[in-house]
Regions:
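An acidic-aromatic substrate-binding cleft motif
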Residues: 142-224, 228
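Conserved, mostly hydrophobic/aromatic
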Residues: 37, 221, 307
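Generic recognition of flexible, low-complexity loop/linker segments
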Residues: 23, 137-140, 216-218, 260, ...
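Intrinsically disordered, low-complexity acidic regions
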Residues: 133, 176, 215, 227-237, ...
């Protein structure tokens, strides 16, 4: 699929008496707009960003669909409510105006910057809020930096928001030379039994990720044309759950024969999707990440799902600059 990337651009450059340079860059597409801030402060080496003053003001009330703002999770219930009654929201913040136009506020090119959420400040106005570091600072940057794009998409019907390429077009170009190995797929796996309490993540008499159970799921996937199977609780360390999780990402439990499982899956035409649950312990995972991904490759596993079911240490937030940079490192290492 090819996307049309046609837009009009305007850059407004400002310089104050201290030679601080700010460029406001706008790109207007047929179905929306993106804008960002580009700063250069020549008299310093680094900058601490304490707030962002961007606001989105609606002319009058309308209907909205969103989840409450959270710097830790997206696993919240969506709410339909008047724009005027929204207290906080994660993006994308989807809305319908009184004139029947659909729209969405979101962001693009989120690199080395905290996620943006929205906060109601009155008069149908939503202010940008950035997920902070533990000390309250929103972002740490050098003396020249560019923010993420802030985006507003519009469409006559809601489906137009899904079909829009605006955010894709505002993201940086792909740096990979080949992308034919990237593909969507369906997968099933061992995890829901743990939530129901009939299986466990750690190795005991109810352990879910066993060789025998793995083969049952592989058989089911093959019979139902499902491309891959994932197993939670396959590796040592689940005994530490609830504290400072210390998983080992290259040591399967004794009842999980990874070589036999991969062999059996290949025989059935099914792939194994690896699982790295960090429990939020990012330092522990990053120490092992390169070796753990290579270990999967050496065992014939080329798919990976990471997990972050737990708070980050020392007050770091999932959607902060710290979290965004970690996820970027994971993607780049996997690629």
């Amino acid at each position: 699929k090819k996307s049309r990337n046609h837009y009009n651009e305007m850059a407004v450059s400002l310089t104050n008496e201290d030679q601080v340079q700010l460029t406001l860059r706008f790109r207007v597409f047929d179905d929306g707009i993106g804008f960002r801030y580009e700063y250069t402060v020549p008299t310093v080496d680094s900058l601490l960003i304490t707030d962002e003053l961007t606001t989105f003001r609606f002319h009058r009330d309308g209907t909205s669909w969103s989840i409450p703002a959270s710097a830790e999770t997206y696993e919240l219930l969506y709410q339909q409510q008047p724009i005027s009654e929204v207290e906080t929201a994660n993006t994308p913040f989807t809305f319908k105006t009184a004139d029947g136009v659909y729209g969405s506020i979101h962001e693009a090119a989120l690199y080395d910057f905290p996620e943006m959420t929205l906060k109601q400040i009155g008069h149908y106005t939503l202010k940008a809020e950035l997920a902070p570091w533990p000390d309250g600072i929103k972002a740490r940057k050098g003396n020249h930096f560019t923010t993420s794009w802030r985006t507003i998409q519009i469409a006559p019907e809601a489906v137009g928001l899904i079909n829009s390429s605006l955010i894709l077009n505002l993201n940086d170009p792909c740096v990979l030379e080949t992308t034919d190995w990237i593909r969507p797929l369906k997968y099933v796996g061992v995890w829901w039994g743990m939530h129901l309490g009939v299986e466990t993540w750690k190795m005991d008499e109810r352990h879910g990720a066993t060789t025998a159970n793995a083969k049952k799921y592989i058989d089911f996937a093959a019979a139902n044309h499902i491309e891959a199977v994932l197993f939670e609780g396959w590796n040592e360390g689940w005994e530490s759950w609830g504290g400072m999780q210390s998983f080992d990402f290259t040591k399967p439990y004794a009842d999980f024969d990874i070589d036999e499982i991969v062999r059996y899956a290949k025989e059935k035409g099914v792939e194994i999707m690896g699982h790295h649950e960090t429990g939020g312990n990012i330092p522990n995972y990053e120490r092992q990440m390169d070796h753990a991904m290579q270990w999967y490759t050496d065992h014939g596993i080329h798919l990976l799902k990471t997990g972050y079911a737990g708070a980050f240490p020392d007050g770091y937030l999932h959607h902060s600059q710290y979290g965004v940079n970690h996820y970027q490192r994971v993607v780049e290492t996997a690629a």
